[in-house]
């Protein structure tokens, strides 16, 4: 919604401008999703993944995040563009979102088990903060509003290293929120 407003506000520069901004980037992924996708019928898989992505989208928007993309079962969200509440608050909002998503996944396990997902679903989360280039990237036929840079790569790597159902944050993010997260 934030990007939509920016693009359709008749501000042509918002469509072509690339900016360097400090962002807090979130990556999550469903553990063993490939195995799950191979074991379920397409309709059941679609129902489960669409339910999951809908629930995560609602939380991301409520927390003020910009949903960058879904890559299969992976979710990328960033804070700090197109609107920023300040580096510290952006990092806090991202962590609040991650904690809410983690809690919601735990609540949804019962639903998923009833719908054929043995043991429910588990996620991993990575969060990193730093300077990114953000804007529209792509070709004449297709553009994506996205963030590029070290924090994007770091958050994806942290997600891959996170223990099941846990959140790993970068040192930079930790320094911004130190003492404010329980």
What are these regions (language model features)?
Residues 78-89, 125-143, 164-166:
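Catalytic strand-loop-helix junctions within cyclic-nucleotide turnover domains
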Residues 1-20, 106:
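Regulatory cytosolic signal-relay segments
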Residues 4, 33, 76, 173-174:
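A generic structural signal for short hydrophobic patches within well-formed alpha-helices
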């Amino acid at each position: 919604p934030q990007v939509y407003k920016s693009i359709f506000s008749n501000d042509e520069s918002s469509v072509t401008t690339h900016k360097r901004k400090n962002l807090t980037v979130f990556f999550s992924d469903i553990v063993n999703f490939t195995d799950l996708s191979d074991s379920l019928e397409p309709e059941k898989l679609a129902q489960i993944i669409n339910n999951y992505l809908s629930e995560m989208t609602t939380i991301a928007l409520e927390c003020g995040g910009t949903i960058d993309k879904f890559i299969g079962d992976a979710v990328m969200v960033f804070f700090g563009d197109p609107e920023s509440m300040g580096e510290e608050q952006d990092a806090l909002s991202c962590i609040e979102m991650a904690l809410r998503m983690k809690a919601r996944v735990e609540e949804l396990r019962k639903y998923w088990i009833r719908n054929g997902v043995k043991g429910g679903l588990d996620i991993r989360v990575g969060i990193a903060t730093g300077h990114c280039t953000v804007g529209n990237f792509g070709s004449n036929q297709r553009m994506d509003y996205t963030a590029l840079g070290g924090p994007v790569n770091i958050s994806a790597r942290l997600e891959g290293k996170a223990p099941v159902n846990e959140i790993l944050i970068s040192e930079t993010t930790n320094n911004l929120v130190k003492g404010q997260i329980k």
